[in-house]
From Swiss-Prot:
GO BP annotation list: fucosylation; protein glycosylation
InterPro entries noted in UniProt: Glyco_tran_10_C, Glyco_trans_10, GT10-like_C_sf
A molecular function (GO) term: alpha-(1->3)-fucosyltransferase activity
Class of this enzyme: transferase
TM ranges: none
The protein's Enzyme Commission number: 2.4.1.-
Protein's UniProt name: Putative fucosyltransferase R654
Keywords on record: Glycosyltransferase, Transferase
Family (UniProt): Belongs to the glycosyltransferase 10 family.
One Gene Ontology cellular component: membrane
Gene source species: Acanthamoeba polyphaga mimivirus (APMV)
Length: 600
């Protein structure tokens, strides 16, 4: 990259520092801040839909939409420039900006976005580029962006809303994002004399005047609990998305795409939130099917499968994510049938097995099985749910703790003796999601000694995010065990306290020869040795808990006695045996017994 064009957004409406900018840059375009009085309800709805009222200040809305206008200007330009430097008026431009610009362009290579801003300490000779750090809160102050990245962003915004796009940039490095270190600019907008009006924005409801020949509209009604995909878009865009997928039944005006809709008598009320008349759009060609939905009961489907077993083979469809993440559970189902054939999603089949990650396929005349990973699913129309908690909304619940499924995600050893090493650190805490109880316990234990926060939540250690790592060689679980193996303790906190719900949060520290300080349901202690843990609910108050942790930390013999406890209650514990029992239990469903709940 040899050159770039500069775009300056004049936030406050007056030309602060423009003279110094012009001294350093040629061909700089200036865009004045938008007038919020000229912004239509449609624009605000399209950009900021799916966030609660009053969530954004006027300042935030203006800033984001100003940058959106700059992106549109770039996308629509006919110049031959591929790189653009967008700067906010509310930044200090150092005298050395010309030099830093040249250094930055030389180091940019083929990165799509480079953020700058946040630090006034500038050492040009030490300038370098690194992957974007989401903790940099001033990323909209100034950045280089390619025309290609701009077009990708605009397309993403069209379907997902602008605020979601910004979050995507921050958290997922959308479009190969990098940043310059040291930063080029220091944000000083707090010192401006002209302060934005920081009043809250309330989203105005707009008219719903859309009538489509190929859809039936149900005003203020919805098929609740049966959603698979949410899109932050207006009604015409939602229809466009729904029409691209033949398996899609319809959508509601809140933005939920439907791959299944209940019978009309089971519809629920939908309040007007975005439009003066929110509701449900259903494709006309599916409407008659909806009215006949669920006329075949689960027990009738079981009888049909049973007859197939005695006369021929059973056709089974398995979706891709069930194959990728839960093949051990799929196999537990397949073992039941001596004669079966795996078929594709467009074929006729007797049984479907879906994992709730991708879009699942549901047919009312087949026996539909759902495999879940999270504890809060509220899906009512599957015949069977292999669930991580004791109860589900399906006709039949088969309980299988996620902690054991997570052990199948490992690519490396599950034997704790393979991870014996000196404990050089105190306590680890590795989470992405910021739940209040997690932060509370992190702060509590940190009162005693520093707890290393290895994830995005409360992060205080420079470490690469591995939460999405999932390859043939290793997964995030393997990485967690390697990290934990250096620590005496691990704060092992589930995201929710739900009967039967336990995950890798408990088992990974134990495999790593650390002591988990565990918060979660106690049902799992049927299989896992509670003496090998510090179980938070056993302590009446935080003082007793913290004293217990201190006592173990300072008493080597006590620490060793806990570490030397067996991990499993059953000395012959085996995942293979658990899955064999699971298969036997699922097989009972297709016997003459009427069963609603099965446990391992």
């Amino acid at each position: 990259m040899e050159s770039c064009k500069i775009i300056c957004i004049s936030q406050t409406g007056y030309d602060k520092d423009i003279s110094s900018i012009k001294e350093n840059f040629a061909g700089c375009d200036f865009i004045k801040s938008i007038d919020m009085d000229q912004v239509t309800s449609n624009n605000i709805l399209r950009f900021f839909k799916h966030y609660d009222n009053d969530i954004f200040t006027l300042n935030t809305v203006k800033t984001i939409m100003n940058h959106y206008n700059a992106w549109e200007k770039i996308a629509n330009s006919n110049d031959n420039i591929d790189i653009y430097f967008i700067i906010d008026e509310a930044v200090t431009t150092p005298k050395t900006i010309s030099l830093t610009r040249q250094l930055l362009l030389k180091k940019t290579n083929d990165q799509q976005i480079i953020f700058v801003g946040g630090n006034s300490d500038l050492q040009c000779q030490d300038l370098n580029i690194r992957p974007f750090d989401h903790k940099n809160s001033n990323f909209l102050s100034a950045y280089l962006i390619t025309k290609l990245a701009v077009k990708i962003l605009l397309e993403y915004i069209y379907y997902n809303g602008i605020k979601t796009t910004i979050n995507k940039i921050i958290n997922d490095c959308f479009g190969n994002c990098f940043e310059s270190i040291p930063y080029l600019f220091m944000v000083n907008s707090q010192n401006e004399k002209n302060v934005f009006d920081n009043k809250r924005i309330t989203f105005p409801m707009i008219d719903n005047n859309f009538e489509f020949n190929d859809y039936i509209f149900y005003p203020n009604l919805d098929s609740a609990g049966n959603d698979i995909c949410e899109v932050y878009a207006d009604i015409p865009t939602l229809r466009e998305i729904a029409n691209k997928d033949d398996n899609c039944i319809g959508f509601n005006t809140y933005g939920w795409i439907k791959f299944f809709v209940t019978k009309e008598e089971r519809f629920t009320m939908l309040k007007n939130k975005y439009y003066r008349c929110d509701g449900l759009y259903v494709k006309k060609r599916h409407d008659q099917l909806i009215k006949k939905r669920n006329t075949i009961m689960t027990q009738d489907k079981i009888k049909i499968v049973r007859e197939k077993l005695s006369n021929s083979f059973v056709k089974i469809f398995v979706n891709n994510d069930a194959k990728k993440y839960s093949w051990h559970l799929v196999e537990a189902v397949l073992k039941i049938f001596p004669n079966y054939k795996l078929v594709g999603p467009t074929d006729n089949y007797d049984i479907s097995i879906n994992h709730l990650v991708e879009q699942f396929i549901f047919r009312p005349d087949s026996f539909n099985i759902l495999i879940t990973g999270e504890p809060t699913m509220n899906i009512t129309y599957f015949d069977m749910c292999i669930d991580t908690k004791y109860t589900s909304q399906s006709s039949i619940t088969v309980y299988y703790p996620f902690i054991f499924s997570s052990m199948r995600e490992h690519r490396k050893s599950l034997n704790h003796t393979d991870y014996i090493k000196p404990k050089t650190k105190f306590c680890a805490y590795m989470y992405n999601m910021r739940y209040p109880h997690r932060i509370w316990y992190f702060n509590l234990v940190s009162k005693y000694r520093q707890v290393d926060a290895l994830g995005k939540c409360c992060n205080n250690v420079d470490i690469k995010d591995s939460r999405s790592h999932f390859t043939e060689e290793s997964t995030y679980n393997d990485i967690a065990i390697e990290l934990y193996s250096e620590y005496k303790f691990v704060l092992a906190l589930e995201n929710i306290f739900w009967p039967g719900y336990s995950t890798e949060k408990l088992i990974n520290p134990m495999i790593a020869n650390s002591i988990p300080i565990y918060w979660g349901d106690s049902t799992i202690f049927k299989h896992i040795n509670k003496k090998r843990t510090i179980y938070i609910p056993d302590f009446p108050n935080e003082t007793d808990l913290l004293e217990h942790i201190k006592n173990i930390d300072t008493n080597d013999e006590l620490y060793k006695s806990i570490i030397n406890e067996p991990i499993y209650i059953n000395p012959d514990f085996s995942l293979d045996k658990l899955e064999e029992n699971l298969s036997i239990n699922i097989g009972k469903v297709f016997s003459d017994q009427e069963i609603q709940t099965l446990y391992i």
